[in-house]
Amino acid sequence: MHNASDIQSALVPMVIEQTAKGERSFDIYSRLLKERIIFLVGQVEEHMANLIVAQLLFLESESPDKDIFLYINSPGGSVTAGMAIYDTMQFIKPNVSTVCIGQAASMGAFLLAGGEKGKRFCLPNSRVMIHQPLGGFQGQASDIAIHAQEILGIKNKLNQMLADHTGQPLEVIERDTDRDNFMSATQAVEYGLVDAVMTKRG
């Protein structure tokens, strides 16, 4: 019985390269990493975040002055996992250019907006969605109150950071993230989440 990740990894294409020492084969993501391209695809969770952070740190060690390109196609996910990626993006020396392919929702949209100003893009038919953080907790009333306070604190922090990245007033962000707020690529530019719609490679 194969699990989903085994099947997925079996479907990842391999690229053959000729080198002075003969042929070398790479999976497609490793080959793109050589071009300083990182893919953030699927749910944002701890394991994925660790891999993205490791790739960012590796590319910084390789060339601290060259841009890194982070392609995002994600429905969102864990706030703490997303913040690990976000903080690393801000921490490292290279500029991180973000590109939305497909969708960037929730934490995916936050990471999209967190790219280097002037280097954040959407492809023409991609979708972006912002909303407030989700939380579900069961237990004693006092514990529920503690978690509710934590979620409120996270919501306020994320809203302030989105305001900083988009240039929108905080009260506008608070209003617009109160419910799921979907945007086209053009609307995401107008809102300040990205800087341009990219139709062709420049």
Swiss-Prot record:
EC top class named in words: hydrolase
Superkingdom of origin organism: Bacteria
Pfam families xref list? CLP_protease
What's a single GO BP term from this record? Answer: protein quality control for misfolded or incompletely synthesized proteins
Instruction: Give the GO molecular function terms.
Output: ATP-dependent peptidase activity; ATPase binding; serine-type endopeptidase activity
Q: Where in the cell is it found?
A: Cytoplasm
Gene3D superfamilies recorded for this chain?
Answer: 2-enoyl-CoA Hydratase, Chain A, domain 1
Active site (catalytic residues): 106, 131
Record carries keyword Protease: yes
Entry's transmembrane regions: none
Q: What is its EC number?
A: 3.4.21.92
Q: Which reaction does it catalyse?
A: Hydrolysis of proteins to small peptides in the presence of ATP and magnesium. alpha-casein is the usual test substrate. In the absence of ATP, only oligopeptides shorter than five residues are hydrolyzed (such as succinyl-Leu-Tyr-|-NHMec, and Leu-Tyr-Leu-|-Tyr-Trp, in which cleavage of the -Tyr-|-Leu- and -Tyr-|-Trp bonds also occurs)
Q: Which UniProt keywords apply?
A: Cytoplasm, Hydrolase, Protease, Serine protease
Name the SUPFAM superfamilies on file.
ClpP/crotonase
Hey, which family's this protein in? Answer: Belongs to the peptidase S14 family.
So what does this one do? Cleaves peptides in various proteins in a process that requires ATP hydrolysis. Has a chymotrypsin-like activity. Plays a major role in the degradation of misfolded proteins.
| Self-association and partners | Fourteen ClpP subunits assemble into 2 heptameric rings which stack back to back to give a disk-like structure with a central cavity, resembling the structure of eukaryotic proteasomes.
Output this protein's name. Answer: ATP-dependent Clp protease proteolytic subunit
